[in-house]
């Protein structure tokens, strides 16, 4: 007998091994029709998979998050089915699930066009309408190789060749004549795939390496039903309006170009925005007791070997050579801060010692992963490191938590989720050390009285970390700040202090950042505010515009008065109609436009308009300055 325990605690008995779908059928026809997969003893399996032992089972439907993920993965396979019918000469590569969607990488001699994407989507809809079953066959490795060799799918053969020799069989999923390999699970029938849409085509490289051949990447999204799909499309339309690349170009903030992939060219207004953020964060450093430092961009690889980055991070590092020595361009700031700490002898009474740096780092991100200024190769972090005693961890983490929340509130974020990323599989140190580090973070958050989610396997290689996830104006979540506890690196790099017994010991090292990458944070700010920044943050806070040439001198005097008060202000003296000027600066999302005619000039006043079109009337320059100063303070 096979005993199946359901989520409500009830049990069902079967005389012989039984599939997930058969269990669902025994419960009811409605559930069977809705069944996508199952979770057997916690493991996701296909609806056709057989249970041959006593087990717990949860039926997965489209109402479950796992069900939607499976729908997306199956849609990627459906892309393959449609593409191979339309363009049989192409070679299929990989088709994973990503956030809110999926993609498929394909090798094609010619780039796909928007017309191709429309044809692929139409063929997918036609295939779904056939309502066919997706068939899973667990197949010996040698036979899988034969299947793909006969079909000329050389990339599939390369992927198989990369797999461990321990893998002797794998799942093949058949969409009629099309076959793909996958761990699964997948939907049992194409009727689950109706709520999908292909979204865009881009280029990618095989294995993410620009030296390899270029692939075509087809992106799509899929949902449980049309209502969810329509809601997603509306969100994406709003996200497109807020796209930082679009706004960055419209407001002349920055640009990127092919000669410097993943590296940003900041324009005057964009750099002004950067400086506002940096100076704000510099004040956070000062107010929190951090001494600002500056460390070299390149360091001999021997230091990265000692720190552990060489073994755990070298694939993401850039290197250069000089006089037969190899140097690494720093991907992180932490080893440099340890070198600063190591200059001199420290007593336990000196701790905690806090260093902060706006440190420029470089990481060799795959070209296909680059995205505007949200994912770059060269970036600057508001990076800080605290060298402290174990007994000081809780108070330091608590203080950081309060700092981080205050910063996020100031920049307009009030929906914040907190997570703890726990030990990854590839890591330094022993379990006892990790136990201690993870317990320290839990304890500190407990003192703060906040709830958190735990993420097994997602910590840094040298320690667990607290992550701050912020929800933006259209409901997207961004991971920003981190606080990491590190018992490893101080010992590896020789950081020491003298304790109360005159013994040398290694301090605990806390790695912290509030905004993280400045580039990424500014990109998030642009999209969160749709380019309409709060007046204190805006790259240009005020534009003073004349109606005729007769007010030019007065406009310049007003501009100078505001500039002398520290405001970011420009004058628009162009020979254009005032209505044109108002429209242009409104589109530029400038918070305030001061209009000056003969009457304002005579009275030493300005007519104040906001970017939303609100007419605040006429006021003296000093009254307007008071208004702007109040917003600065806020």
UniProtKB/Swiss-Prot annotation:
Pfam families: HGTP_anticodon, TGS, tRNA-synt_2b, tRNA_SAD. Zn(2+) binds at residues 334, 385, 511. One of its GO terms (molecular function) is metal ion binding. GO terms for biological process: threonyl-tRNA aminoacylation. Belongs to the class-II aminoacyl-tRNA synthetase family. Homodimer. Catalyzes the attachment of threonine to tRNA(Thr) in a two-step reaction: L-threonine is first activated by ATP to form Thr-AMP and then transferred to the acceptor end of tRNA(Thr). Also edits incorrectly charged L-seryl-tRNA(Thr). HAMAP family: Thr_tRNA_synth. This is Threonine--tRNA ligase. It comes from Xanthomonas oryzae pv. oryzae (strain KACC10331 / KXO85).
């Amino acid at each position: 007998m096979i005993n199946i325990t359901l989520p409500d605690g009830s049990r069902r008995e079967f005389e012989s091994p039984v599939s997930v779908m058969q269990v669902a059928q025994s419960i009811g026809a409605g559930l069977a029709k809705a069944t996508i997969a199952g979770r057997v003893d916690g493991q996701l399996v296909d609806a056709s998979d057989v249970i041959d032992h006593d087990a717990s089972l949860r039926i997965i439907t489209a109402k479950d998050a796992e069900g939607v993920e499976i729908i997306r993965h199956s849609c990627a396979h459906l892309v393959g089915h449609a593409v191979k019918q339309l363009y049989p000469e192409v070679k299929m590569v990989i088709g994973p699930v990503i956030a809110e969607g999926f993609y498929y990488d394909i090798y094609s001699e010619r780039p796909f066009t928007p017309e191709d994407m429309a044809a692929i989507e139409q063929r997918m809809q036609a295939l779904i309408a056939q309502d066919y079953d997706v068939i899973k066959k667990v197949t010996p490795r040698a036979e899988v190789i034969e299947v793909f060799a006969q079909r000329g799918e050389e990339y599939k053969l390369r992927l198989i060749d990369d797999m461990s020799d321990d893998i002797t069989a794998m799942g093949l999923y058949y969409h009629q004549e099309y076959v793909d390999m996958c761990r699964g699970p997948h939907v049992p029938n194409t009727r689950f795939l109706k709520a999908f849409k292909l979204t865009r085509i881009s280029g990618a490289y095989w294995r993410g390496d620009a030296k390899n051949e270029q692939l075509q990447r087809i992106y799509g999204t899929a949902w449980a039903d049309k209502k969810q799909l329509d809601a997603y499309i509306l969100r994406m339309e709003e996200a497109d309006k807020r796209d930082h690349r679009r706004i960055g170009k419209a407001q002349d903030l920055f640009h990127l170009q092919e000669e410097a992939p993943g590296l940003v060219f900041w324009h005057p207004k964009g750099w002004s925005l950067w400086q506002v953020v940096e100076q704000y964060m510099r004040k956070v450093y000062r107010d929190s007791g951090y001494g600002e430092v500056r460390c070299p961009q390149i360091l001999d690889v021997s230091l990265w070997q000692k720190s552990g980055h060489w073994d755990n991070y070298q694939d993401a590092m850039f290197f250069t050579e000089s006089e037969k020595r190899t140097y690494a361009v720093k991907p992180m700031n932490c080893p440099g801060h340890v070198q600063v700490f190591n200059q001199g002898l420290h007593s336990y009474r000196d701790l905690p010692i806090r260093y902060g740096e706006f440190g420029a780092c470089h990481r060799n991100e795959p070209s296909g992963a680059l995205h505007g200024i949200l994912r770059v190769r060269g970036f600057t972090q508001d990076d800080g490191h605290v060298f402290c005693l174990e007994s000081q961890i809780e108070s330091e983490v608590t203080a950081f938590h309060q700092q981080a929340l205050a910063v996020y509130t100031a920049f307009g974020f009030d929906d914040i989720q907190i997570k703890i990323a726990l030990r990854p599989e590839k890591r330094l140190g022993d379990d006892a050390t990790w136990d201690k580090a993870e317990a320290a973070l839990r304890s500190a958050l407990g003192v703060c009285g906040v709830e958190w989610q735990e993420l097994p396997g997602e910590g840094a290689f040298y320690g667990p970390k607290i992550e701050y996830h912020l929800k933006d104006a259209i409901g997207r979540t961004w991971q920003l700040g981190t606080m990491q506890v590190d018992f490893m690196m101080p010992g590896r790099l020789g950081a020491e202090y003298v304790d109360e017994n005159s013994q040398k010991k290694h301090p605990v090292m806390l790695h912290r950042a509030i905004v993280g990458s400045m580039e990424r944070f500014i990109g998030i700010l642009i999209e969160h505010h749709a380019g309409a920044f709060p007046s204190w943050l805006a790259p240009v806070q005020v534009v003073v515009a004349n109606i005729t040439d007769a007010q030019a001198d007065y406009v310049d005097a007003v501009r100078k008065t505001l500039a002398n008060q520290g405001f970011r202000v420009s004058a628009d003296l162009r020979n254009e109609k005032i209505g044109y000027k108002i429209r242009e600066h409104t589109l530029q999302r400038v918070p305030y436009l001061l209009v000056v005619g003969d009457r304002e000039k005579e009275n030493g006043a300005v007519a104040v308009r906001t970017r939303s079109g609100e007419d605040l009337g006429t006021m003296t320059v000093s009254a307007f300055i008071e208004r702007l100063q109040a917003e600065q303070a806020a």
